Amino acid sequence: MAEAIRSDWSVDEVEALLRLPLLDLVGRANGVHRAHHAPDDIQKASLLSIKTGGCPEDCAYCPQSAHHREVELTREKLMNPDHVVSLARRAQRAGAERFCMGAAWRQVRDGAEFDNVLAMVRGVRALGMEACVTLGMLRPHQAQRLAEAGLTAYNHNLDTSPEFYGQIIGTRTYQDRLDTLAYCRDAGIELCCGGIIGMGESLRDRAAMLQVLANFAPHPESVPINALIPIEGTPLAHRERVGIFDLVRMVATARIIMPLTRVRLSAGRSDFSAAEQALCFLAGANSVFYGDVLLTAPNAGTGADAELFAALGALETA
């Protein structure tokens, strides 16, 4: 089923998709997926925290925020570029095609640390891997420098809908996020941009977040769908975990409205069984974060994933 590529979705349209009977929704999404992607092609991306903790932002879900003093987390300074590249090489040997590097910063500052990040990007690209970073807010000249270093994609999530956003984050505006994404796109960097479900948002909030993403022109190269991992010491520590059908609905709807985008299963994936994850792939997911740790949270291990992909007959992306 070849869906037209659109960037004019309304929130009502997206919400109507989210509310479809589940099997109808998954069936439609699978048709769209097969029209644009090989169904057994699942990209593996590895994610490393290159600077951990002490972030001045107040994101309610994040254990790396300096505002959440009860979280048990060891702060770590920015890693050495050579060490990061060696870890990228190890991830590549384990099957990862993309290496993503995250620094717990509010925004990038020019200087030695940014120069080191640029060296990391160049080193990862020299391995033949795709390189992605998430560093907080950028200015236009910094996006240009990242592009010149060979950066494949910049991750900067919207997190949730514009309407619900203020209940989760108070130190950075929604427009700040959109501005950084625009600077990256202007520099020729692909966008990796998604959000989180399970923070107390409504179904309409989920639809509104997807609508913002689907109305980018062109659509983001990849859209990570995260299920909240409640972390003790954060304001969302006692939120109920997301059920699999909520995640499947998000994946399927993202696939229908963004046919060419890689839809990535991200945080919270390890909560779900192999059969539940397979349902997400049937609904259109075609990328995962691969490895034992996802920044500071546990992730499905490479051994379990190898068994899963073997059972699915999934191919490695070239």
Curated annotation (Swiss-Prot):
This is Biotin synthase. Catalyzes the conversion of dethiobiotin (DTB) to biotin by the insertion of a sulfur atom into dethiobiotin via a radical-based mechanism. SUPFAM superfamilies: Radical SAM enzymes. Gene3D superfamilies: Aldolase class I. It comes from Ruegeria pomeroyi (strain ATCC 700808 / DSM 15171 / DSS-3) (Silicibacter pomeroyi). Belongs to the radical SAM superfamily. Biotin synthase family. The keyword S-adenosyl-L-methionine applies. Homodimer. The keyword 4Fe-4S applies. GO terms for biological process: biotin biosynthetic process. PANTHER family: BIOTIN SYNTHASE, BIOTIN SYNTHASE, MITOCHONDRIAL. It is an enzyme of class 2 (transferase). [2Fe-2S] cluster binds at C100, C132, C192, R264. Binds 1 [4Fe-4S] cluster. The cluster is coordinated with 3 cysteines and an exchangeable S-adenosyl-L-methionine. Binds 1 [2Fe-2S] cluster. The cluster is coordinated with 3 cysteines and 1 arginine. Keywords: 2Fe-2S, 4Fe-4S, Biotin biosynthesis, Iron, Iron-sulfur, Metal-binding, S-adenosyl-L-methionine, Transferase. It comes from the Bacteria. [4Fe-4S] cluster binds at C55, C59, C62.
